[in-house]
């Protein structure tokens, strides 16, 4: 009987550890937000990961295109890019696959607030 209790306790502990270790935190959520982002160091990779599959000149007709510094800056100024990413009242949330993690949105917010630094 004691062996069964120990085995059951070990099983419950193993399941608990497994569930706890499977949190869905991304690197950005764990590492924090970049306070002084630049396009080349931070924003470009977010656009490539989350946006260019639909917003690239070579693969889509979805305007605005988000492949270059000038295109992304223009989208922020003229297409409400940040509002769309934040999921505010300016249209459907982008990307369509679901809202970006808050840490990535904050990087874009900081980039815009600092005047769109490229390098």
Per-region residue spans from a language model:
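Sec-dependent bacterial lipoprotein signal peptides
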Residues: 1-21
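Aromatic- and Gly/Pro-enriched helix-to-coil junctions and flexible linker segments
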Residues: 4, 22-119
């Amino acid at each position: 009987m004691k062996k069964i209790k120990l085995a059951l306790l070990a099983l419950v502990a193993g399941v608990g550890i497994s569930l706890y270790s499977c949190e869905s935190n991304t690197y950005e959520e764990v590492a924090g937000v970049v306070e002084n982002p630049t396009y080349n160091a931070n924003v470009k990779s977010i656009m490539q990961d989350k946006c260019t599959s639909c917003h690239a000149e070579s693969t889509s007709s979805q305007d605005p295109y988000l492949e270059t510094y000038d295109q992304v800056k223009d989208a922020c100024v003229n297409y409400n890019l940040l509002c769309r990413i934040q999921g505010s009242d300016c249209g459907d949330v982008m990307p369509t696959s679901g809202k970006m993690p808050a840490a990535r949105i904050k990087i874009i917010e900081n980039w815009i607030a600092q005047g769109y630094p490229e390098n």
